[in-house]
Amino acid sequence: MQNNTKFKAYIMLMRLHRPIPILLILWPTLTALVLASHGIPDIKYLIVFTIGVVVMRTVGCIVNDIADIDFDKYVERTNTRPLTSGKLSVKNALYLCLALTIIAFICVLFLNLYTILLSFVALFLAVLYPFCKRFFAIPQLILGLAFNFGIFMAFSAIENQIPLEAWIFYLSTICWTIAYDTIYALADRDFDLEIGIKSSAVLFGDKVFKYIFLFNFISLILLIALGIYLSFNIIFYIGVIISAFLFIRNYFLYKKLGITNCIKAFSDNHWIGLIIFILVVIQYL
């Protein structure tokens, strides 16, 4: 029984019981693979990048819980996490984090030297984000850089370069990430204000909804720019319009505030990532 409890604690530490953030990282990465391949990517890249996304997401979660262990106990949503509640020790977490990092590095060894070098930047960003909440006003920006860095790695792995379309798509996904993680941060804003944690939801204050709209809008404009640059057909732009309607639908959900509404609005963003992925695949059929 004790082993079963500890196993569940490890699952919670790695957030494997909540797969939506994995999808939020995976869809842009897979989309970048399709863009770089000008069609369906080689199975090797699909396997390596999918494993890499899952593993690095879990590494980020573990580092986050280690960094926030003294803060999480004051936040209603996080005070039952394995490290905060004592179900696992920091030593347990560090060993797991090291093992997962080694797995990620083994995966990247199947790629070219350029991508291997970029993987160190990806690791740095993943580790940096949890600590930014102490000193950086918009840690969601760092999260956007980290979550979507797989875009650069996808292009470097296949094309051995980072072309203009990669930059356009990367900037679009960063804006998208800032928007949806600001929604997520709304769930904890009152607690963050009390304990001095920084977030875009805290920084934007009463204008937070306007800023979420702004970042979503910029994200869509950059997607349109990507479509124009790559000469995509009308189907792509119809999908962008559908994404805009989903952003509007989410607005009426997260505007109600409350943990449940904010988490639901945050989670629903993965459908937008899926839509863009499907639209890009269609362009190369």
Curated annotation (Swiss-Prot):
Pathway this chain belongs to: Cofactor biosynthesis; ubiquinone biosynthesis
Pfam family name, one: UbiA
Localization in the cell: Cell inner membrane
Transmembrane segments: 20-40, 43-63, 88-110, 114-131, 135-155, 166-186, 200-220, 265-285
Membrane topology reported for the UniProt record: Multi-pass membrane protein
Cofactor entry: Mg(2+)
Chief place where the protein resides: membrane
GO MF term (any one): 4-hydroxybenzoate polyprenyltransferase activity
Keywords associated with the record: Cell inner membrane, Cell membrane, Magnesium, Membrane, Transferase, Transmembrane, Transmembrane helix, Ubiquinone biosynthesis
Gene Ontology CC terms: plasma membrane
CDD domains per record: PT_UbiA_COQ2
Catalytic reaction equation(s): all-trans-octaprenyl diphosphate + 4-hydroxybenzoate = 4-hydroxy-3-(all-trans-octaprenyl)benzoate + diphosphate
The protein's Enzyme Commission number: 2.5.1.39
Top-rank EC class of the record's enzyme: transferase
GO biological process, one term: ubiquinone biosynthetic process
Family in the record: Belongs to the UbiA prenyltransferase family.
Function field: Catalyzes the prenylation of para-hydroxybenzoate (PHB) with an all-trans polyprenyl group. Mediates the second step in the final reaction sequence of ubiquinone-8 (UQ-8) biosynthesis, which is the condensation of the polyisoprenoid side chain with PHB, generating the first membrane-bound Q intermediate 3-octaprenyl-4-hydroxybenzoate.
Name of the featured protein: 4-hydroxybenzoate octaprenyltransferase
Source organism (scientific name): Francisella philomiragia subsp. philomiragia (strain ATCC 25017 / CCUG 19701 / FSC 153 / O#319-036)
